[in-house]
Amino acid sequence: MDSVVFEDVAVNFTQEEWALLGPSQKKLYRDVMQETFVNLASIGENWEEKNIEDHKNQGRKLRSHMVERLCERKEGSQFGETISQTPNPKPNKKTFTRVKPYECSVCGKDYMCHSSLNRHMRSHTEHRSYEYHKYGEKSYECKECGKRFSFRSSFRIHERTHTGEKPYKCKQCGKAFSWPSSFQIHERTHTGEKPYECKECGKAFIYHTTFRGHMRMHTGEKPYKCKECGKTFSHPSSFRNHERTHSGEKPYECKQCGKAFRYYQTFQIHERTHTGEKPYQCKQCGKALSCPTSFRSHERIHTGEKPYKCKKCGKAFSFPSSFRKHERIHTGEKPYDCKECGKAFISLPSYRRHMIMHTGNGPYKCKECGKAFDCPSSFQIHERTHTGEKPYECKQCGKAFSCSSSFRMHERTHTGEKPHECKQCGKAFSCSSSVRIHERTHTGEKPYECKQCGKAFSCSSSFRMHERIHTGEKPYECKQCGKAFSFSSSFRMHERTHTGEKPYECKQCGKAFSCSSSFRMHERTHTGEKPYECKQCGKAFSCSSSIRIHERTHTGEKPYECKQCGKAFSCSSSVRMHERTHTGVKPYECKQCDKAFSCSRSFRIHERTHTGEKPYACQQCGKAFKCSRSFRIHERVHSGE
């Protein structure tokens, strides 16, 4: 007959169950365990042959060590393998429900008290004395997988992972469990009991592990660190799940369809698509859901809870998906890119709606070009691109617009309204997209990267325009002369060469400009402002295009390549001038003598031979020059350089 050990008859609790016991219940547990130990120790000793008092002293020391070891393990350790049949303690009840903790090691029969076990033991012919296991010894080995256990109770429960035995069945829903602790925790999903309450925020939890993980949100503790990428986690399950992103492991396979999953929770939810099980039922409206996250999100419809708060603007959301979508308004992130036209979108529904235009599967189809729309308002706005209708007219200047949003933005140019303010520098903007793009000048964020050359952009429109450098696409064509342009701004400026329109007038000197950027640059000649500073050498520029061209002197970047000979240039104007050496085009013609030039700068210098203008004057001797190059050469006469 196998020996009977103290661990075989001890009543064990999980760490969660032990935490629920009150001080009086813990004291009762210690007293019962000590009495059990005395009774068990008396089986294998001949009291008549030894000094009784010595034995009592020895037994007292040993039982104290054993009971303290059990209690310490419950108070301090991370419980792993010791899970056995236990009472279901409630925090406010002082009763202690007894189970049958005394099991015969020969035949497995259970008894309520030790004396009954003693009487039963005599029915077996062989009898061995009590044997004390050394601390840490694991004498129970699983024949299936070789795993070893210190306690018979843990070993029996482990065997169920192989046999599939689930002796604990829920009366409410019929679900069965291998472990009593799992069964007790499951019962709480029906009763709604949440015994673990956070003292910081009052939130309550069904599971102790979830409660511990939640507490780390307040403390900021993240004890689990990934060796691969250094990412830290507050919860061990999150850490284990993360490790699988590196290993690619998907240990949970569906027996129905063969699909494998990285996470057990995802696997469980997937299984319900086959079984139709929906264990999470709303008490308010009776709706049942298969997924706990969907259930929690649904509950918020009734409670109005909005736990996801935006740090930028304070707006709160009930659902994490809505919150993530909102965050993109601030960051400008548009993860859904159309491969057809390059347009990017914040949300998947917006992207899908846009794709209908290309596929032609929408209910509202344009008869002119075949583009389709799922929204009637979008369809109406699109039709105006063909009809030329512009129903929204500005009362201030008479300018008309096909779209109400464009009209509202235009009105702000007259009212001066700038409702969108940068929190970093206080600069205000009339348009929300403009403030998002501006904020990136502070953060340095450039989310749009060119796959051709690796260049990154803070603004999606700049990115799309840049792509046309590689593709050569020029979608904007002038109806007057047939000239095509890559950029709408260039096209609009070109149109003004035909109309002669110069809407931007300088208040200082009255000079007018056809282009807003030229106007802003001109204003800086009066103010002396040079807002663009090179981080490499500190040189400052009044124009953003000038600093970009200058930066290329440091980086060596030459993005503009001649298609004829392959020569590359840092500046777009340089490549255009160079291309004229191949084509022979000389667009700048002198009205005085009919001489033509390929370069505007050469043309301006030539004009000075007729006008006599010499804008470069030497401060040393007063001599003047019509060309900056001649002026610099002259200066060396004085400097001796």
Swiss-Prot record:
Keyword check for Mitochondrion: no
Domain KRAB, first and last residues per copy: 4-75
Cross-referenced Gene3D superfamilies: 6.10.140.140, Classic Zinc Finger
A Gene Ontology cellular-component term: nucleus
Location relative to the cell: Nucleus
Chief location category: nucleus
Family matches, as Pfam families: KRAB, zf-C2H2
One GO-annotated biological process of the protein: regulation of transcription by RNA polymerase II
A GO term for molecular function: DNA-binding transcription factor activity, RNA polymerase II-specific
Database matches in InterPro entries: KRAB (IPR001909), KRAB_dom_sf (IPR036051), Znf_C2H2_sf (IPR036236), Znf_C2H2_type (IPR013087)
Zinc finger (C2H2-type): 102-124, 140-162, 168-190, 196-218, 224-246, 252-274, 280-302, 308-330, 336-358, 364-386, 392-414, 420-442, 448-470, 476-498, 504-526, 532-554, 560-582, 588-610, 616-638
SMART domains: KRAB, ZnF_C2H2
UniProtKB keywords: DNA-binding, Metal-binding, Nucleus, Repeat, Transcription, Transcription regulation, Zinc, Zinc-finger
Source species, domain of life: Eukaryota
Function: May be involved in transcriptional regulation.
Family that this chain belongs to: Belongs to the krueppel C2H2-type zinc-finger protein family.
Protein name as catalogued: Zinc finger protein 709
